[in-house]
């Protein structure tokens, strides 16, 4: 929900889409990140129409102001992870311990 083009309420995970659509979005985001060689924290945004067709709209290769919502949902400190990844730690290292996207 937005007010004056600023997000004031965020629902996460999105309650209005099916698991099938959620999986399509996740798979698309992972494919894009692999394709461009992106290996750090970022946000990919999708729109979904009434028939649940997802459309990619943008990628923000940075931590957004709403990152605290993601941290609450996932239990992952994104800022620390971003620094560790920049230092060369892989996601599945014991320091970061994100072994698969399914764990998030």
For each predicted feature, which ranges?
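ATP-dependent carboxylate activation and anion-phosphoryl transfer catalytic cores
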Residues: 1-104
């Amino acid at each position: 929900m937005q007010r004056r083009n600023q997000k004031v309420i965020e629902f996460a995970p999105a309650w209005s889409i099916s698991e099938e659509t959620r999986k399509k979005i996740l798979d698309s985001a992972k494919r894009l990140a692999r394709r461009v060689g992106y290996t750090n924290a970022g946000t990919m945004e999708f729109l979904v129409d009434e028939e649940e067709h997802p459309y990619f709209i943008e990628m923000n290769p940075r931590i957004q102001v709403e990152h605290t919502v993601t941290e609450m949902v996932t239990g992952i400190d994104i800022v620390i992870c971003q620094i560790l990844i920049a230092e060369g730690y892989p996601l599945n290292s014991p320091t970061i311990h994100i072994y698969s996207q399914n764990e998030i």
